[in-house]
């Protein structure tokens, strides 16, 4: 609450200007920095896809999404990560079709 400058009441106390506090560093947890994103993109460009990613692409093209999701979950551990990876691989397929 803002101070009123009056000695009594709910907002009692001397009027002061609020100090501008920088946000905590911990609030950025999980967010990728520009540098990290850049380095990862370079590594992916140079190294290519992992063997399981190539297999995922093959499964998406032939057997459909369900098999691909099952394999991705087995390799990555969680359902959420698997869904994200399968979506990423479908984007890779779409990119390869465009070029």
UniProtKB/Swiss-Prot annotation:
Keywords: Cytoplasm, Ribonucleoprotein, Ribosomal protein
Top-rank taxon, per record: Eukaryota
Record carries keyword Ribosomal protein: yes
Subcellular location: Cytoplasm
InterPro entries: Ribosomal_eL36, Ribosomal_eL36_sf
Ribonucleoprotein recorded as keyword: yes
GO function terms (MF aspect): structural constituent of ribosome
Segments crossing the lipid bilayer: none
Gene Ontology CC terms, in alphabetical order: cytosolic large ribosomal subunit
Any single biological process term in GO: cytoplasmic translation
Function, as annotated: Component of the ribosome, a large ribonucleoprotein complex responsible for the synthesis of proteins in the cell. The small ribosomal subunit (SSU) binds messenger RNAs (mRNAs) and translates the encoded message by selecting cognate aminoacyl-transfer RNA (tRNA) molecules. The large subunit (LSU) contains the ribosomal catalytic site termed the peptidyl transferase center (PTC), which catalyzes the formation of peptide bonds, thereby polymerizing the amino acids delivered by tRNAs into a polypeptide chain.
UniProt family annotation: Belongs to the eukaryotic ribosomal protein eL36 family.
Self-association state and partner proteins as the record states: Component of the large ribosomal subunit. Mature ribosomes consist of a small (40S) and a large (60S) subunit. The 40S subunit contains about 32 different proteins and 1 molecule of RNA (18S). The 60S subunit contains 45 different proteins and 3 molecules of RNA (25S, 5.8S and 5S).
Name by which UniProt lists this protein: Large ribosomal subunit protein eL36
Species of origin: Candida albicans (strain SC5314 / ATCC MYA-2876)
Gene: RPL36
């Amino acid at each position: 609450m803002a101070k009123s400058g009056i000695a009594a009441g709910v907002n009692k106390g001397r009027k002061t200007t609020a100090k501008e506090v920088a946000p905590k560093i911990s609030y950025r947890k999980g967010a990728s920095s520009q540098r990290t994103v850049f380095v990862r993109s370079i590594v992916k460009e140079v190294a290519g896809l992992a063997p399981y990613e190539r297999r995922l692409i093959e499964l998406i093209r032939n057997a459909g999404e369900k098999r691909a999701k099952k394999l991705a979950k087995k390799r990555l551990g969680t359902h959420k990560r698997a869904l994200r990876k399968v979506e990423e691989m479908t984007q890779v397929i779409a990119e390869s079709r465009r070029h």
